[in-house]
């Protein structure tokens, strides 16, 4: 895994990724091909915080790094306004689930995805575009934007906990049991000091309780 700590480092730091370890929004996960164990594919997750306002940066980044799959959070654009044409010109198929001003998730891929799912199967939180998935080369890629929760006293904190519980139920259901899963996104959760760039400043933050 390659990590730049949100752009703090000029050169990405290489970190060994272990099963269930926490991924930060701009981490680059390197997937080794099982046939020969030599070549690798890039799967990247990025909280873009408005895709239209970051479009020039996004296109430059795609041209430079050329990931196989890019998962975006906080696209903040309605479905009919998603910039799919520009991304197609850059060589990427786009799959998106959005809304005006807030939230929004998307998956960009060099190869077409199949069985695209938007939102929860049980229609939980259907007014918020926070979950999308699709099948890529026999793997279900799940892209999620978890609520931030503000603070433990906020009415939004129980919403975050419920969302995480619903997400666990979703991926544990029979409809997700047939294929390997890679779940990425912005979880608004940091599990240990290695998951934040300033542990002292972040201590006690709603997303960081070591």
Go through each PLM region and give its residues.
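Short, flexible loop segments at the rims of nucleotide/cofactor-binding pockets, characterized by
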Residues: 45-51, 119-122, 158-161
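Metal-dependent phosphoesterases centered on the DNase I-like endonuclease/exonuclease/phosphatase
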Residues: 90-91, 163-210
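Active-site-proximal loop/helix segment associated with metal-binding centers of metalloenzymes
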Residues: 140-159, 197-210
